[in-house]
Amino acid sequence: MGYGWGIFEGMLVIGSLCLLGSAGLWFLNRRLYKEYEEKRALVQIIFSVVFAFSCNLLQLVLFEIIPVLSREARMVNWKVDLFCLIVLLVFMLPYYHCYLMLRNTGVRRERAAVGALLFLTAFLYAFWRMGIHFPMPSDKGFFSMPQLVSRIGVIGVTLMAVLSGFGAVNLPYSYISLFIREIEESEIKSLERQLMQSMETCIAKKKKILLCQVEVERSLVSEEHQKGKSFFRRFVGTVVRSVQDDQKEQDIKLMEAEVEGLEELSKQLFLEIYELRQAKDAAAFSRTWKGHVQNFLGYACSIYCVYKMLKSLQSVVFKEAGTKDPVTMMISIFLQFFDIGVDAALLSQYISLLFIGMLIVISVRGFLTNLMKFFFAVSRVGSGSSSNVVLFLSEIMGMYFLSSILLIRKSLRNEYRGIITDVLGGDIQFDFYHRWFDAIFVASAFLSLLLLSAHYTSRQIDKHPID
């Protein structure tokens, strides 16, 4: 019976990893890549594997609350998952990312491999030096699990705090109808006319460039036919044609520069029209019943975000440990005043399960949303390979989800923390990561507040920056 149950647990773990890997592959190809030209098989495999191991960490947190697997199976799953994820994040991804970048620049395989190895050595040295400035587990080797997890946690928690701080300000700004500007159709039509005029001018310039290039080619052909004429005529013809060709080449370069400027202007106009269309749709949506509900949720989120910012600021200034989540605290107060005949400990356990589940879902959804925004922004601005961007995002994704375990652990009841503490390392300074998160969160939130305030003010003063 025990042997059969062990096989069942192993198949369940492998099946869940395969399912998560397939979901990561689907997300990469359907939501990130879309129409991008380069789809390296190894890059897709690495992304899906990192996605599977990262989401499996959050799945294991739920398994601690809902005993789907035995304690031994969960312990093995935790250790294998952390080991594989750390090997990918600290060793494989930095090496292969550097190797691929060197290969894309035309470096030969042997030199690219040596260059990637040197980069990995420098990366490991910088990774080790980072531990000097932060509290790390004592009496442990650099390549031990607690040391590596602690260093990854610093980077990942910083990333989470920056995203959370921006989200705490941007979420109310996006949801509350107070910040939604009414857009007139005439404003959009005016920009569309400018866009059409810019595109028509760009097309006309490109036609002129082609005609000039054809004339230059014709002059070269006519020069070949002039070889049979006298030396004086050939000399005069060559001088005249060289002057004309130089003038035409200068005209071509000038028109090409104008075309680049027009294309950039067209791109900015298109983005402005797209943003205005979105703002117009948002204004129309805000007048529906769903919009009113979203507006109410926006105010509720604003209150919670202000509460979170104040509590984080209190934690940073007075160095106080974080208190209970406000939702759990309100339910505890409710149970004290109203006896509904439910065991408080049992209800607290279910609330804990629901709260952790919501944390996990919001964490995954929020990260994937920011992942898509970052990918599209980098792919639109830069000319680098999309594979390099995906490898970079794989590194960030693994660090993000691993660090989320360090923070979620504090929200668990004491009986659910045992395995997580043992696997990550009992001497990891868990409280430090919460204080570090609060400090970066406050800085990110206030900086985002200043930027969004400046953006809102400038938008009110000047409605059309590209007119």
UniProtKB/Swiss-Prot annotation:
Description of what induces expression: Not induced by abscisic acid, cold, salt or drought treatments.
Residues that, per the record, bind GTP: 381-410
Tissue/organ expression: Expressed in cotyledons, leaves, stems, roots, flowers and guard cells.
Membrane-protein topology: Multi-pass membrane protein
Pfam families: ABA_GPCR, GPHR_N
Alphabetized UniProt keyword annotations: Cell membrane, Coiled coil, Endoplasmic reticulum, Golgi apparatus, GTP-binding, Membrane, Nucleotide-binding, Receptor, Transmembrane, Transmembrane helix
TM ranges: 7-27, 45-65, 82-102, 112-132, 152-172, 296-318, 322-342, 344-364, 388-408, 436-456
Activity regulation: The GTPase activity is Mg(2+) dependent and is strongly inhibited by the interaction with GPA1.
Matches recorded under PROSITE patterns: PROTEIN_KINASE_ATP
Gene Ontology CC: endoplasmic reticulum membrane; Golgi membrane; plasma membrane
Coiled coil: 243-276
InterPro entries: ABA_GPCR_dom (IPR025969), Golgi_pH-regulator_cons_dom (IPR022535), GPHR/GTG (IPR015672)
Disrupted-gene phenotype: No visible phenotype; due to the redundancy with GTG1. The double mutants gtg1 and gtg2 are hyposensitive to abscisic acid.
Chief location: membrane
Compartment annotation: Cell membrane; Golgi apparatus membrane; Endoplasmic reticulum membrane
GO molecular function, one term: GTP binding
Tree of life domain: Eukaryota
Additional record remark: Has both a topology similar to GPCRs and a GTP-binding/GTPase activity.
Family the entry assigns: Belongs to the Golgi pH regulator (TC 1.A.38) family.
Described function: Abscisic acid receptor. The GDP-bound form exhibits greater abscisic acid binding than the GTP-bound form. Required for seedling growth and fertility.
Self-association state and partner proteins as the record states: Interacts with GPA1.
Protein's UniProt name: GPCR-type G protein 2
Organism in which the protein naturally occurs: Arabidopsis thaliana
Gene: GTG2
